[in-house]
From Swiss-Prot:
Database matches in NCBIfam families: miaB-methiolase (TIGR01574), MiaB/RimO family radical SAM methylthiotransferase (TIGR00089)
Protein's gene: miaB
Main location: cytoplasm
Gene Ontology molecular function terms on file: 4 iron, 4 sulfur cluster binding; metal ion binding; N6-isopentenyladenosine methylthiotransferase activity
A GO cellular component entry from the record: cytosol
Its job: Catalyzes the methylthiolation of N6-(dimethylallyl)adenosine (i(6)A), leading to the formation of 2-methylthio-N6-(dimethylallyl)adenosine (ms(2)i(6)A) at position 37 in tRNAs that read codons beginning with uridine.
Record keywords, A-Z: 4Fe-4S, Cytoplasm, Iron, Iron-sulfur, Metal-binding, S-adenosyl-L-methionine, Transferase, tRNA processing
Catalysed reaction, written as an equation: N(6)-dimethylallyladenosine(37) in tRNA + (sulfur carrier)-SH + AH2 + 2 S-adenosyl-L-methionine = 2-methylsulfanyl-N(6)-dimethylallyladenosine(37) in tRNA + (sulfur carrier)-H + 5'-deoxyadenosine + L-methionine + A + S-adenosyl-L-homocysteine + 2 H(+)
Domain TRAM: 380-447
Protein name (Swiss-Prot/TrEMBL): tRNA-2-methylthio-N(6)-dimethylallyladenosine synthase
Required cofactor(s): [4Fe-4S] cluster
Assembly notes: Monomer.
Native source organism of the sequence: Burkholderia cenocepacia (strain HI2424)
Length: 457
């Protein structure tokens, strides 16, 4: 009987990418297949996030629930990976003695060896070292599921914002060699991937050697240009970027590379220079707005999303008003916004914070409501227009229909003859948007490529 692995992912897209790699590593080494049901699993892994306290505590809550599964199935192995593992290390085993494996983001490729050591010794295995780029040298080729894929181009972050734990849990910035990234993207394209999202904690800081050991360096703009030249790749996205390193070279890339989507996630974190300074972000609101102004001069239709922290220590009503003014001016088309959560070991955790929780919550609700209104307005403005989408697969709402994604990252559901589904999936097609809903759009097929056209008859 085929053994199975269950992975629960918390947090960012980097973690989603790492979770897929965990499955790939265990499939290549031990033939394990992925399952969506923990009760069916022989190995249960939690890929964790420590950016906010709530996410961290939820991991231990989930661990408590799977403990019962291990009692019923003694051979079951339980592992904790990701940023909580990197931060907490062996203390996870002290708190939850039934955990067998603790590994960091940089050591997931060692899972097979850790499993062997656990079975041989009967003792929990902990490996949260930072072996830099070694991870990518030991990962098997990706197994593609659909026409979109993530590709990690670098690890870690060297910005050390005062509130952020990432540099301590993922290490400093280390870039993959250019040819290594291009080889992975080309392999994905050969398997039918049409859209890649280049991943990193701060992709703007990418400085990859042209080849392993080379002293010649490629910046992020160069990487994008090379990826765009790979046959089969139709769209390029990236996340996450940092305003401080959004260079003119990168801005100019939006004029040179049509495959680079007109959708940008650029975290601002706050709209007050005073708070940005306390956060150690390294830029002002005016500098942030200057980047967006230059980008929109090239791409007037640029869709913008961001991250925002409400209730940072010392935030006044005036600071929050400045944040809201920026929201209105930028016209954000999504924001990942949260109340500030102090993380142990970060400088901001020691700052005095006298703003009541109720005030922070009220501010957050106001911010999120304003952005939701803007999201609805943008979605409604798309009704009646023809949008180019990448068809990703059957619709979640109705498997008899198909779903694709627009450049500004909206899901579009549309009807298509069942016989055409296999041929349409993975293609770029045009749809006319007929309806806008809170979290999706609905449209109709209006124009497809010659290959897809024959599939609809």
């Amino acid at each position: 009987m085929t053994k199975k692995v269950y992975v629960k992912t918390f947090g960012c897209q980097m973690n989603e990418y790492d979770s897929d790699k965990m499955v790939d590593v265990l499939n290549a080494a031990e033939g394990l297949e992925k399952t969506d049901t923990p009760e069916d699993a022989d190995i249960i892994l939690f890929n964790t996030c420590s950016v906010r306290e709530k996410a961290q505590e939820k991991v231990f809550s989930d661990l408590g629930r799977v403990r019962e599964l291990k009692e019923a199935k003694p051979g079951l192995l339980i592992g904790v990976g990701g940023c909580v593992a990197s931060q907490e290390g062996a203390s996870i085993v002290s708190r939850a003695p039934y955990v067998d494996l603790v590994f960091g983001p940089q050591t997931l490729h060692r899972l097979p060896q850790m499993i062997d050591a656990r079975r041989a010794s009967g003792r929990a295995q902990v490996d949260i070292t930072f072996p830099e780029i070694e991870k990518f040298d030991h990962l098997p080729p990706a197994r593609v599921e659909g026409p979109s894929a993530f590709v990690s181009i670098m690890e870690g972050c060297s910005k050390y914002c005062s509130y952020c734990v990432v540099p301590y849990t993922r290490g400093d910035e280390v870039s993959r060699p250019l040819d290594d990234v291009l080889t992975e993207v080309a392999g994905l394209a050969d398997q039918g991937v049409r859209e890649v999202t280049l991943l990193g904690q701060n992709v703007n800081a990418y400085r990859g050697a042209l080849t392993a050991g080379s002293t010649d360096i490629a910046d992020f703009a160069t990487l994008i240009e090379y990826v765009a030249d790979i046959p089969g790749i139709e769209r390029i996205r990236y996340t996450t970027s940092h305003p401080k390193e959004f260079t003119q070279r990168l801005i100019d890339t939006y004029a040179k590379v049509p495959k680079l989507v007109s959708h940008l996630h650029l975290p601002v974190q706050h709209g007050s220079d005073r708070i940005l300074m306390a956060m150690k972000r390294g830029y002002t609101v005016l500098e942030y707005k200057s980047v967006i102004r230059k980008l929109r001069a090239i791409r007037p239709d640029l869709s913008l999303s961001t991250d925002m922290i409400v209730g940072f220590p010392g935030e006044t009503e005036d600071d929050f008003d400045k944040m809201m003014a920026l929201v209105h001016e930028m016209g954000y088309d999504t924001s990942f916004s949260f109340i500030y959560s102090p993380r142990p070991g970060t400088p901001a955790a020691n700052l005095a914070d006298d703003t009541p929780r109720e005030v922070k919550l009220k501010r957050l609700q106001h911010l999120q409501a304003t952005i939701e209104e803007n999201v609805a307005r943008i979605s409604q403005s798309m009704v009646g227009k023809v949008e180019r989408i990448l068809v990703e697969g059957p619709s979640r709402k109705d498997p008899n229909e198909l779903a694709g994604r627009t450049e500004n990252n909206r899901v579009v559901n549309f009807p298509a003859p069942l016989a055409s589904h296999p041929r349409l999936i993975g293609q770029m097609i045009d749809v006319k948007i007929n309806h806008a809903y809170p979290h999706s759009l609905r449209g109709e097929l209006v124009l497809v490529s010659d290959d897809a056209s024959t599939a609809t008859h």
